[in-house]
Design a protein with these regions (language model features):
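Envelope-exposed proteins and targeting segments
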Residues: 15-18, 51-53, 75-79, 127-131
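Active-site-adjacent substrate-binding region
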Residues: 89-116
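Stable alpha-helical elements in mature extracytoplasmic
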Residues: 4, 8, 37-41, 93-96, ...
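Solvent-exposed loop/turn segments at secondary-structure junctions
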Residues: 25-29, 59-64, 86-89, 120-123, ...
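Soluble non-cytosolic domains of exported or imported proteins
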Residues: 2-3, 31-35, 87-95, 139-147
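A short, glycine/acidic-enriched catalytic loop
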Residues: 62-89, 97
Length: 168
């Protein structure tokens, strides 16, 4: 788990953004994952009211051909942003997702799979700026997913400064 967490340190060090990283996994059984994590997210938000964004990281369950692209350093997992629309206020999550998607394509053209909207909640009703990010898929190697993180970290930092400056 530290190996997955470590690439996120530049978000704090290089970009000056504080990062709260919750590393527990709640995906078994899969059909109860969001229900199981919901009280944890509520608690984190209650204990940290200064949080500007909540990001839920996953790997997608689709084929490698869809989730992979090649950059100079090798294959990387592509990024998909998922927004749930079955709750009031989902539009603020979509606004954040649109900004992040633009920054991803600026930082690393071709790395984004875009934004998908589903009639779900994904616990995104718990915070006004909450998004689900799929990095690669179940057929991608850990190394491919880790190669994505610096690009995503830069895009998230750029998104943070652009989105919250323009919405203040």
């Amino acid at each position: 788990r530290e190996r997955v967490r470590q690439p996120w340190y530049p978000v704090q060090e290089q970009y000056g953004l504080p990062l709260l990283y919750h590393r527990d996994i709640y995906d078994l059984p899969r059909n109860l994952a969001y229900e199981k994590i919901r009280p944890v997210i509520k608690g984190i938000i209650a204990e940290n009211p200064q949080l500007d964004m909540v990001i839920d990281l996953h790997r997608d369950g689709v084929r490698r051909e869809i989730t992979t692209t090649t950059f100079p350093e090798g294959d990387v997992g592509k990024v998909l942003i998922v927004i749930g629309t079955r709750h009031p206020g989902w539009e603020s999550n979509l606004a954040l997702a649109l900004c992040l998607n633009r920054e991803l394509e600026t930082v690393a053209p071709g790395i984004s799979r875009g934004i998908r909207q589903y009639n779900e909640i994904y616990n995104q009703d718990l915070h006004a700026h909450s998004i689900l990010i799929e990095i690669g898929g179940h057929e991608n190697t850990l190394e491919e997913v880790l190669r994505t993180v610096p690009y995503l970290a830069e895009a998230l930092a750029r998104t943070y400064y652009r989105f919250f400056e323009q919405n203040e």
